[in-house]
UniProtKB/Swiss-Prot annotation:
This is Inhibitor of apoptosis protein. Prevent apoptosis of host cell by inhibiting caspase-3/CASP3 activation to promote the viral replication. Also induces the activation of host NF-kappaB. One of its GO terms (molecular function) is zinc ion binding. Its main location: host cell.
Amino acid sequence: MFPKINTIDPYISLRLFEVKPKYVGYSSVDARNQSFAIHDIKNYEKFSNAGLFYTSPTEITCYCCGMKFCNWLYEKHPLQVHGFWSRNCGFMRATLGIIGLKKMIDSYNDYYNNEVFVKHKNRVYTHKKLEDMGFSKPFMQFILANAFIPPYRKYIHKIILNDRYFTFKFAAHLLSFHKVNLDNQTTYCMTCGIEPIKKDENFCNACKTLNYKHYKTLNFSVKL
């Protein structure tokens, strides 16, 4: 289960709580249960207890902070995922408290760093795919070692514009958008992938005008 990029509130960390729920009609567990039940969804209690209600077959939403999640149907830990991506959600803080929420986020970090990372790292075809794209082995090793670990995960999520799934497709997109060659320490334009740029830049001069709307939101570079 992963958040939809356009529903991540960049300013939510500046607020202590979402004072008023965005979807008041789903404030009760019964209302959230009903949203799943009428669509014949099984084992939905874990989602409604996590403050989430059914929106569509590909999407569920938090009634309080309004964050939407996709690829959710087989998620085993919806409460942890919700807390991880929306840690200032009023529902999450009221349910777990600040200390409890921090402990849960730490444990979920461990889960991703161990189970999820190891599972994807063992996929040999991914190494081959990245190698076919023309990237050096040192850079592939760097990406495969850090793609699922903060702080690099937040960079990856900002880059992805089309694919929402948290798999090695993220690493592949990261490589294609922001090509960094560790052999000569050269960084290339995120748009054309051809023109070399400064370490603190993302686009070459020719592509900056094409990316004006996104330039500020994508104003970051992977720290090696």
